[in-house]
Regions:
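Oxyanion-binding/catalytic loops of NTP- or PPi-dependent enzymes
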Residues: 2-7, 11-102, 126-130, 139, ...
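Short, ordered beta-strand-loop transition motifs
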Residues: 62, 111-119, 127
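Short, charged beta->alpha transition segments
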Residues: 106-110, 144-147
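Hydrophobic alpha-helical hairpins/lids featuring a short glycine-rich hinge
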Residues: 132-134
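Short amphipathic beta-strand and strand-loop transition segments with alternating hydrophobic
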Residues: 107-114, 465
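A generic secondary-structure signal marking the coil-to-beta-strand transition
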Residues: 57, 119-121
Length: 593
């Protein structure tokens, strides 16, 4: 371990100040990895109470006790109803979302009810114990901070948290809400694929030069698959000279393709074998037995990645009856044949969004535990048409280490060597509004207008201004997602509402009546997509211009601009997906009424 720390400190030059440690949390579907930076320790993965480098994202809720990590996983076998897993898939989802339907199928032991106020999901464990997915995540984040503080031996408040690149505005805000409940200051939500790319680049800083390198990262984890094309090169900056840069060029994903789905195929196969051995019993009717079979399927999947066959065995599976059955890798691959056919999909999506072809990709690197499945590698290698797949990155910890490097860079306590990150928003966003127009026959009609705010793969952080030139009275506009034709039908249904919010402006007419002697330069709405990929409406203003003559001295005519902040607007979250209060909709409104 000492050698690892020494090697890291050679790469990073930290300037230690009197401040607290910072942390990162890589929130995977199945498990999380936590990393810290503190004075004297450049970067380190946090060990949990069992001295493990990763911790199951599982919460077991008893009447007077909360269990986390391995302890909670143990309860998922003993009492499956109280152990909550994979709940991140429910963040920001309405009760009728297909992701909720899938969750109910995967975990029938949990009762999901509707939050009548927000139309979202509530876990109902009892009449007194009801929690939203955000509250469950807040518990996990609070626990992760406790582990970090125990490991760092000092308080930790600031964190960078990873999220899937395909998280939309509602999902990102749900994570921020959870962090707020956990009293964590989020320095940034970083896309997990970007964190991996940053970790890769930081440790290869010397290999990055003015020549473009295009690297494809293929990340298949427990719950999802993401393919990312990243361009590395050095660029000149005004403040710090020539520095390395990574740019996210293309992204493809499959929300439900991962190790968990493979485990369910194996579990159902084991169910079939047991029921065949014991025709008088039906293991499906016993929640504990089904939980045991899912756990064994997880173990079996891992072993079959290294062996041609293995014997699955569970003592006392049902009514003290033991279960034993031999399963081959070929049987496993046959069970998951349709899943393996989906492996190339994210690659094709990433190439399409980057407008690149395979010849331009210099290397393909594997990330994520499920890429260890041999058939995944076989299908992927054929899809990318390369001689080999890169395995020169820590598939489990790359995102956590990249995120903690970013945490150090954002913290005022440390100074790190600059590494420029240009992330990209994969979902386009547009502003839509309707205004009255006059036809040739002098009749009036309504015209629907669309203005692109952020295109697909637009870099962020970035500020944008939309100008409305033809309004002289109160009006409204909608902020919606743009063209999502690149999504599959399943992804589109899981995406949720395409409407982010509706903004009703009040006070427009008053501002015009008060400035009749001025020339209007339009009504400007100022938007900001921050480092976390979260969109906000900063302010709305009317801009007027007038000509001021200064005759006595310079005999010149000057043009003067006059900006009027609109005194009031009403913001309506119509058809909005979950947004944590306050505010009660998808925009953070930084506006003084």
């Amino acid at each position: 371990m000492a050698n690892k720390i020494q090697r890291s400190s050679h790469i990073y030059s930290f300037c230690i100040a009197d401040a607290l440690a910072v942390m990162s949390v890589d929130l995977g579907s199945e498990s999380m990895k936590i990393a810290i930076v503190k004075p004297g320790v450049p970067m380190e993965i946090v060990l949990n109470k069992e001295s493990q480098r990763k911790t199951p994202v599982t919460v077991a809720l008893k009447e007077n006790e909360r269990l986390f990590g391995d302890s909670a996983m143990g309860m998922s076998i003993k009492n499956p109803k109280i152990a909550l897993r994979y709940f991140q898939d429910l963040l920001g989802k309405h009760i009728d979302n297909p992701q909720v339907t899938l969750y109910r199928w995967r975990f029938p032991q949990h009762e999901l009810v509707k939050d009548e106020r927000r139309q979202t999901v509530i876990f109902k464990l009892s009449h007194e114990m009801q929690y939203s997915p955000e509250e469950i995540l807040a518990m996990v984040l609070n626990y992760s901070r406790g582990l970090a503080e125990e490991f760092a031996e000092q308080p930790v408040k600031d964190a960078v948290i990873t999220v899937p690149v395909y998280f939309n505005q509602a999902e990102r805000r749900a994570v921020l809400h959870a962090a707020q409940m956990a009293d964590l200051k989020v320095l940034q939500l970083i896309n997990d694929n970007t964190a991996v790319a940053l970790n890769y680049g930081v440790f290869r800083r010397k290999d990055i030069n003015a020549t473009v390198q295009n690297i494809m990262f293929y990340d298949m984890g427990a719950g999802n698959t993401v393919c990312t094309i990243v361009t590395y090169q050095t660029v000149k900056t005004k403040d710090s000279g020539t520095q390395p840069q990574l740019q996210i060029r293309g992204v493809g994903f499959d929300r439900t393709l991962g190790g968990l789905e493979m485990e369910y195929r194996l579990r159902d196969y084991l169910v079939k074998l047991f029921n065949k051995q014991q025709p008088s019993k039906d293991v499906r009717q016993n929640l504990r037995a089904m939980a045991k079979l899912l756990k064994e399927a997880n173990r079996l999947k891992t072993i079959l990645s290294a062996n041609a066959d293995h014997v699955a065995q569970i003592e006392g599976l049902l009514d003290d009856v033991d279960f034993k059955a031999k399963v081959s890798r070929q049987e496993f691959e046959d069970l998951c044949s349709d899943l393996f056919q989906r492996v190339p999909g994210p690659v094709l999506q990433a190439l399409s969004s980057a407008e690149m072809n395979l010849d331009e990709i210099d290397q393909v690197i594997l990330v994520g535990g499920a890429t260890r499945v041999p058939k995944v590698q076989e299908v992927l290698l054929k899809a990318v048409d390369k001689d080999e797949l890169g395995k020169n990155i820590n598939a489990d910890e790359a995102a956590a280490m990249g995120a903690v490097y970013q945490a150090a860079a954002l913290s005022k306590a440390f100074k790190v060597k600059p590494f420029i990150v240009r992330d990209a928003a994969i979902f386009p966003i547009q502003v839509e509004f309707t205004r009255e127009v006059e036809e040739e026959d002098k009749s009036k009609s309504l015209k629907h207008n669309k203005r692109i705010l952020f295109q697909r793969m637009a870099p962020y952080p970035q500020r944008k201004v939309i100008t409305f030139n033809r309004y002289t009275d109160d009006f409204e506009f909608c902020v919606n997602y743009g063209d999502l034709a690149f999504l599959s039908q399943d992804d589109l249904q899981a995406f949720g509402s395409l409407n982010l919010t509706t903004v009703k402006l009040r006070g427009v007419g008053d501002s015009f009546r008060k400035h009749l002697d001025y020339e209007s330069k339009g009504i400007k709405a100022h938007f900001n997509m921050d480092e976390s990929g979260v969109l906000s409406l900063d302010r709305v203003e009317s801009v007027f211009e007038t000509v001021v003559e200064d005759k006595p001295e310079e005999e010149s005519t000057l043009t003067s601009k006059y900006t009027v902040l609109l005194p009031k607007y009403i913001w309506v979250a119509r058809n909005s997906v979950l947004t944590p209060p306050p505010p009660t909709g998808p925009f953070t409104v930084l506006f003084i009424f």
